[in-house]
Amino acid sequence: MKKVAIVGIRGYSGLELFRIFYYHPEVEVTKIYATSHYGEKLSEHFPQLEGLTDLTISEFNEEEIMAECDAVFFATSAGVSQKLALTFIDNNFPVIDLSGDFRLADLEIYNKWYKNTNLKNEYLLSGQYNLADIGQAKANYIANPGCYATATLLALYPLVKNKMIDLDSIIVDAKSGLSGAGKGLSDASHFVNVVDNMSMYKINSHQHIPEIAQQLKIWNSNFQALQFSTSLIPVSRGIFVSSYAKVAADFDFETIKNAYEQVYATKNFVRIRRQMPHLSDVIGTNFCDIGLAYNPVTNVLSVVSVIDNLMKGAAGQAVQNFNQLFGYDESLGLKFMPSL
């Protein structure tokens, strides 16, 4: 039985981690940390946990974590783990980081997109960015992919890796539920401004753009850039990504469909659907559902991918990475059915 700590327990992703591990047969959450409410029971803040846990919130203590736990999860906003995780890196202690602090390998690019960082390059390079359905977690510092990046990369991987599309033609239209913005209050997330509405935000400036570009470049060195837009939709959770690209010469739709089937045939959490997927099909699960369509008039392939931003886009994939790192079946504790 592995013991783990969660830093950022009062956030959406932190609480989702706790929910997953409650059902994980090989893990016990023994330490939970937040920036306030020390000594108070978690169930005092989340009444739905009454009778399920007696854990109390503690002030962050890296020495305590390394002495009493086998791994630590950072379910924190950008800028936190780059300060608090350095001791763990120095001691080669297992960390799964759900934030964007260690996802980019280039310090100059990191500073451009995340701003105001004092992170040193040697620390930035210490982590392994691991898209769990494509790679294998091996390093003791795992940078968990972002929600938009996860849905986009899983949609594009077979195409980019196998050179099936014109790389200069990639357009991605990504939509997120409100929990993707975290718990911070703003006009953009105010109920009155969100309900019965849809709005675009961070056009051409979302921090997941360089993360996506970095990985696509690894898969195909000829990749240069993509057009990526993000919108908020009035649902509590979920990511709905529509990706478009021109099909390269010598490839037909059947060949492309077969490529997706072959790439993901052995993957536990990627499902290639015969029809276009619905967002509700994946809510509460670690699945990514993908649907394909081809327009022969324009020679454009449409790829729709849907995930739960708090599961596959955050906590679910983090546990999948943890399972890989510690030698468990990667699906252990993650076989949730979609909620109705």
Swiss-Prot record:
Pfam families linked to this entry: Semialdhyde_dh, Semialdhyde_dhC_1
UniProt GO cellular component terms: cytoplasm
Catalytic activity: N-acetyl-L-glutamate 5-semialdehyde + phosphate + NADP(+) = N-acetyl-L-glutamyl 5-phosphate + NADPH + H(+)
Stretches of the chain forming a coiled coil according to its record: none
Active site as annotated: 147
EC number, as in UniProt: 1.2.1.38
GO MF assignments: N-acetyl-gamma-glutamyl-phosphate reductase activity; NAD binding; NADP+ binding
Keyword line: Amino-acid biosynthesis, Arginine biosynthesis, Cytoplasm, NADP, Oxidoreductase
Major localisation: cytoplasm
Compartments (UniProt record): Cytoplasm
Family: Belongs to the NAGSA dehydrogenase family. Type 1 subfamily.
Function: Catalyzes the NADPH-dependent reduction of N-acetyl-5-glutamyl phosphate to yield N-acetyl-L-glutamate 5-semialdehyde.
Listed name of the protein: N-acetyl-gamma-glutamyl-phosphate reductase
Species, as recorded: Lactococcus lactis subsp. lactis (strain IL1403) (Streptococcus lactis)
